[in-house]
UniProtKB/Swiss-Prot annotation:
Mn(2+) binds at H262, D294, D296. Keywords: Cytoplasm, Isomerase, Manganese, Metal-binding, Rhamnose metabolism. Catalyzes the interconversion of L-rhamnose and L-rhamnulose. This is L-rhamnose isomerase. One of its GO terms (molecular function) is L-rhamnose isomerase activity. Binds 1 Mn(2+) ion per subunit. Belongs to the rhamnose isomerase family. HAMAP family: RhaA. Its main location: cytoplasm. The gene is rhaA.
Length: 419
């Protein structure tokens, strides 16, 4: 430890102690909060099923930065590079299209064996795994419907895919000793004015009930469902709306997924956390950065990211909220995108843990809103960066922008050689 870092650390401890915060306890709490990194940033949501196929489902990955992963070996190598530069506990979130097989596998036929390499890799890297059925980028989703499809055979295909995905998810949890959160998101919707909005939702309700009918140990598997306001090609009607999934998660007691980009631009998920937690047992968060729409830009340390972290910490939701990331930017170095976004999420959590919440709550309860605002603003100037640097030091990761040197070296030696 350098003398400069030691001095900054000691000063930070004193400054935070003055407002009643134990920084060592804050770091212990931070080590209880894993962030689930999403594998699809590494290859622009291509997967291994049909890497040259088109990305569909009303989502887009824009840009053509060189060096994207072309297979599982490259993707895992890129992930390892990113993991080395991010302090503290992490998880990895996989989509079904990241299976590995020597022969083609239909999505309704995926099995745990197709993800064995991921499990062994996760064990070696001390990671938990999360999972997602992939209900897009497939011929049977081309007309914009999956679990709510009017054709019973096509609908059953997607039901069977989700059921198979749940078995994979339970396998992850059983093998790794930590529950896998499996999130169901479907692109189902219509481009223009929709006359019958009810029937597709009735079909979706029945399909989801069949999907979750097989029981799994919650120590191994957790179901989550995710809404969306609209997607490209589904601007006028989305079957799986917020109201639909809020009702479903409440009535079936599944987890509810809140994606930062899946609501109207004037809405924020930080305000939805406390409301949803009154009705559902768990929340899955997809922290992202929507720019005018669900653009999935890299997460910043901005007001909304901070507000999300603060909601988790202020209400002690550590065991009920699962933090995941969801962005995919192909215009910048993909390893750097992982590092920037994940470190920012962890910084936000640390800043929330360093807040004198009890004092602020007392001021609020007494009606002293002047002092509440003053303290919130003064808190921003306290030396949280010194605490972050100590956290990085303890986890053998670069504290400042030095991590970028490692990414540049990796880009020169590895990524630049990919055609």
């Amino acid at each position: 430890m350098t003398t400069q870092l030691e001095q900054a650390w000691e000063l930070a401890k004193q400054r935070f102690a003055a407002v009643g915060i134990d920084v060592e306890e804050a770091l212990r709490q931070l080590d209880r909060l894993p962030v689930s990194m999403h594998c699809w940033q590494g290859d622009d949501v291509a997967g291994f099923e049909n890497p040259e196929g088109s990305l569909t489902g009303g989502i887009q990955s824009t840009g053509n930065y060189p060096g994207k992963a072309r297979n599982a070996t490259e993707l895992r190598a890129d992930l390892e590079q990113a993991l080395r530069l991010i302090p503290g506990p992490k998880r990895l979130n996989l989509h079904a299209i990241y299976l590995e097989s020597d022969t083609p596998v239909a999505r309704d036929q995926i099995k745990p064996e197709h993800f064995k390499n991921w499990v062994e890799w996760a064990k070696a890297n001390r990671l938990g795994l999360d999972f997602n059925p992939t209900c897009f980028s497939h011929p049977l989703s081309a007309d914009g419907f999956t679990l709510s499809h009017p054709d019973a055979k096509i609908r059953q295909f997607w039901i069977d895919h989700c059921k198979a995905s749940r078995r994979v998810s339970a396998y992850f949890g059983e093998q790794l000793g930590t529950p896998s959160v499996m999130n169901i998101w479907i692109p189902d919707g219509m481009k223009d004015i929709t006359v019958d909005r009810l029937a597709p939702r009735q079909r979706l309700l029945e399909a989801l009930d069949e999907v979750i009918s097989e029981k799994f140990d919650p120590a191994h598997h957790i179901d989550a469902v995710e809404s969306k306001l609209f997607g490209i090609g589904a601007e006028s009607y989305t079957v799986g709306s917020n109201e639909f999934y809020m009702g479903y998660a409440t009535s079936r007691q599944t987890a509810l997924c809140l994606d930062a980009g899946h609501f109207h631009p004037t809405e924020v998920i930080s305000d939805k956390i406390s409301a949803a937690m009154l009705y559902v047992p768990r929340l899955l968060l997809h922290v992202s950065r929507p720019v005018r729409w669900d653009s999935d830009h890299v997460v910043l340390l901005d007001d909304e990211t901070q507000a999300i972290a603060s909601e988790i910490v202020r209400h002690n939701l550590f065991d009920r909220v699962h933090i995941g990331l969801d962005f995919f930017d192909a215009s910048i170095n993909r390893v750097a995108a992982w590092v920037i976004g994940t470190r920012n999420m962890k910084k936000a959590l640390l800043r929330a843990l360093l807040e004198p919440t009890d004092q602020l709550r007392q001021l609020e309860a007494s009606g002293d809103y002047t002092a509440r605002l003053a303290m919130l603003e003064e808190q921003k100037s306290l030396p949280w960066q010194a605490v972050w640097e100590m956290y990085c030091q303890r986890h053998d990761t670069p504290a400042g922008s030095q991590w970028l040197d490692s990414v540049r070296t990796y880009e020169k030696e590895i990524l630049s050689k990919r055609s």
